[in-house]
From Swiss-Prot:
<keyword id="KW-0929">Antimicrobial</keyword>
<comment type="subunit">
    <text>Monomer.</text>
</comment>
<keyword id="KW-0326">Glycosidase</keyword>
<keyword id="KW-0378">Hydrolase</keyword>
<dbReference type="GO" id="GO:0003796">
    <property type="term" value="F:lysozyme activity"/>
</dbReference>
<dbReference type="GO" id="GO:0031640">
    <property type="term" value="P:killing of cells of another organism"/>
</dbReference>
<keyword id="KW-0494">Milk protein</keyword>
<keyword id="KW-0081">Bacteriolytic enzyme</keyword>
<comment type="similarity">
    <text>Belongs to the glycosyl hydrolase 22 family.</text>
</comment>
<protein>
    <recommendedName>
        <fullName>Lysozyme C</fullName>
        <ecNumber>3.2.1.17</ecNumber>
    </recommendedName>
</protein>
<comment type="function">
    <text>Lysozymes have primarily a bacteriolytic function; those in tissues and body fluids are associated with the monocyte-macrophage system and enhance the activity of immunoagents.</text>
</comment>
<dbReference type="GO" id="GO:0042742">
    <property type="term" value="P:defense response to bacterium"/>
</dbReference>
Length: 20
């Protein structure tokens, strides 16, 4: 699956790495 920017941001945020 190819992640969109929104999905990537949400994934990182869920992991506690909010860099967007």
């Amino acid at each position: 699956k190819i992640f969109t920017k929104c999905e990537l941001a949400r994934k990182l945020r869920a992991e506690g790495m909010d860099g967007f």
